[in-house]
């Protein structure tokens, strides 16, 4: 079984067959998961903001989500996300598969009662799969590496914050760093493909409208999911079916 974690629109795009909605109790809380099949492959999908879309980024229970996936036998987790572009030269919409991230603020961990230090990062195998698939089938420009800067949310960033972080990163979002950290702590492989749906605050001389960002993300989510579906098939063939 392969895990998929997506944003607010993933469950609106009907990709799963034989869907079973389930709630899994974990040591970190309850996770809601849709289990089903994509092209005959067993997958487990989590909507990171909850079925009711009522969990803002700073309140997502990443530990419960990833622990629940692991309890189902998932070893590989592919994320989908929406990010703001930190480079004026990027065209919109684009896809970016980040190779690293900066997350100074979330502090997420499963190790609250023990002293354990992991070396965080995205899984390079999954990243390479996403890059290969995106280059082959995406109709969007593909940015095959970049640094993802995670802010706490739920508010958007100030112009001053963007002016600072654009020196260190290529895109800005609110969840992928936390997901990558928890995945690594639980021994799961994780990488993410993101749609660039807007320019971050101050990158271009234009106002930022959250409702417009949401609409753009919804429009572009299908392209992102197309990549994820093909990546799921490739991971299944190369890493699961052969074992």
UniProtKB/Swiss-Prot annotation:
<dbReference type="GO" id="GO:0019509">
    <property type="term" value="P:L-methionine salvage from methylthioadenosine"/>
</dbReference>
<feature type="site" description="Important for substrate specificity">
    <location>
        <position position="157"/>
    </location>
</feature>
<dbReference type="GO" id="GO:0017061">
    <property type="term" value="F:S-methyl-5-thioadenosine phosphorylase activity"/>
</dbReference>
<dbReference type="InterPro" id="IPR035994">
    <property type="entry name" value="Nucleoside_phosphorylase_sf"/>
</dbReference>
<feature type="binding site">
    <location>
        <begin position="198"/>
        <end position="200"/>
    </location>
    <ligand>
        <name>substrate</name>
    </ligand>
</feature>
<feature type="binding site">
    <location>
        <begin position="48"/>
        <end position="49"/>
    </location>
    <ligand>
        <name>phosphate</name>
    </ligand>
</feature>
<feature type="site" description="Important for substrate specificity">
    <location>
        <position position="210"/>
    </location>
</feature>
<feature type="binding site">
    <location>
        <position position="174"/>
    </location>
    <ligand>
        <name>substrate</name>
    </ligand>
</feature>
<keyword id="KW-0808">Transferase</keyword>
<dbReference type="GO" id="GO:0006166">
    <property type="term" value="P:purine ribonucleoside salvage"/>
</dbReference>
<protein>
    <recommendedName>
        <fullName>Probable 6-oxopurine nucleoside phosphorylase</fullName>
        <ecNumber>2.4.2.1</ecNumber>
    </recommendedName>
</protein>
<dbReference type="GO" id="GO:0005829">
    <property type="term" value="C:cytosol"/>
</dbReference>
<feature type="binding site">
    <location>
        <position position="8"/>
    </location>
    <ligand>
        <name>phosphate</name>
    </ligand>
</feature>
<comment type="function">
    <text>Purine nucleoside phosphorylase which is highly specific for 6-oxopurine nucleosides. Cleaves guanosine or inosine to respective bases and sugar-1-phosphate molecules. Involved in purine salvage.</text>
</comment>
<dbReference type="Pfam" id="PF01048">
    <property type="entry name" value="PNP_UDP_1"/>
</dbReference>
<dbReference type="InterPro" id="IPR000845">
    <property type="entry name" value="Nucleoside_phosphorylase_d"/>
</dbReference>
<comment type="similarity">
    <text>Belongs to the PNP/MTAP phosphorylase family. MTAP subfamily.</text>
</comment>
<comment type="pathway">
    <text>Purine metabolism; purine nucleoside salvage.</text>
</comment>
<keyword id="KW-0660">Purine salvage</keyword>
<comment type="subunit">
    <text>Homohexamer. Dimer of a homotrimer.</text>
</comment>
<keyword id="KW-0328">Glycosyltransferase</keyword>
<dbReference type="InterPro" id="IPR010044">
    <property type="entry name" value="MTAP"/>
</dbReference>
<feature type="binding site">
    <location>
        <position position="175"/>
    </location>
    <ligand>
        <name>phosphate</name>
    </ligand>
</feature>
């Amino acid at each position: 079984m392969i895990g998929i974690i997506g944003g607010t629109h993933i469950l609106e795009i009907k990709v799963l067959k034989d869907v079973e909605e389930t709630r899994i109790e974990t040591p970190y809380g309850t996770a809601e998961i849709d289990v089903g099949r994509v092209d005959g492959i067993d997958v487990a999908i989590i909507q990171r903001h909850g079925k009711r879309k009522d969990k803002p980024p700073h309140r997502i229970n990443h530990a419960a989500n990833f622990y629940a996936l692991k309890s189902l036998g998932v070893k590989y987790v592919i994320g989908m996300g929406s990010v703001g572009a930190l480079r004026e030269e990027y065209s919109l919409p684009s896809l970016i598969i980040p190779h690293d991230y900066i997350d100074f603020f979330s502090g997420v961990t499963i190790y609250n009662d023990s002293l354990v230090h992991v070396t965080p990062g995205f899984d390079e195998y999954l990243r390479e799969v996403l890059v290969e698939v995106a280059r082959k089938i995406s109709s969007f420009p593909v940015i095959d590496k970049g640094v993802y800067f995670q802010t706490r949310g739920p508010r958007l960033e100030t112009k001053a914050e963007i002016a600072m972080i654009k020196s260190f990163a290529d895109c800005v979002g609110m969840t992928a760093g936390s997901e990558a950290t928890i995945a690594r702590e639980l021994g799961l492989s994780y990488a993410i493909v993101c749609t660039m749906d807007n320019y971050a605050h101050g990158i271009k001389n234009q106002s930022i409208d959250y409702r417009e960002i949401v609409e753009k993300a919804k429009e572009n989510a299908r392209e992102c999911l197309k990549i994820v579906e093909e990546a799921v098939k490739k991971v299944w063939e190369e890493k699961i079916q052969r074992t």
